[in-house]
Amino acid sequence: MNFEIINTRRNNKIYTNRIDTYKVFNENYDKRLVFLESFITTEVEAAGVKVPSIKEVTFNDNHWCFKSDSIKGDTLFSLIKNDPDNVDKYLDKMVEVHTSIHKFKCPKLPIQKDKLTDYIKLSDLDEGMKIDLLDMLNTCPKHNKLVHGNFTPHNVLVS
């Protein structure tokens, strides 16, 4: 079976054989983060968001891997790259997708505002910067609406 690499990221590579998609994490990637991502993806799917359904999580040759359904379509990044004259149309689509995600609620997921607060407090930033960031964050509402943790044109498929 032939596998095509479709994306390379900082912590993983994504392959497909046109039937399934495989997200292969870098060697020795933290097991807890793999299962956390699997849990989050499953909760998002259960909420009704169209995401690839994870079929299995495996460990082989020091690499954690998700196997999921392949979704046909092009990333917004590739559409923008191949058709730059219509970048405004694609950015409008990205805004549409992003705002539609906020309509979903996932009460079992960590609250994004709490996560960001913890990240800021535990960061190596100077105290003044931490205070400024926490002040800005405190102006945001606290809710359990779904927030995409890595929303980029690379992560939006248009079918």
Q: Could you say what each language-model-derived stretch is?
A:
Residues M1-N17:
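ATP-binding glycine-rich phosphate-binding loop
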Residues R9, N17, N60, T139-P141, ...:
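A generic fold-level signal
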Residues R10-N11, T21-F66, S78-S100:
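A conserved alpha-helical element in kinase catalytic cores
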Residues T16-D20, V158-S159:
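Active-site beta-strand-loop-beta-strand hairpin of nuclease catalytic cores
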Residues F25, I71, N150-T152:
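Anionic group-transfer/hydrolysis microenvironments
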Residues A46, K72, K103-C106:
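Residues at helix-coil transition
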Residues F66-D74:
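Short pocket-lining segment of the protein kinase catalytic domain that shapes the ATP-binding cleft
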Residues K103-H154, S159:
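An alpha-helical support segment within catalytic cores of ATP-dependent transferases
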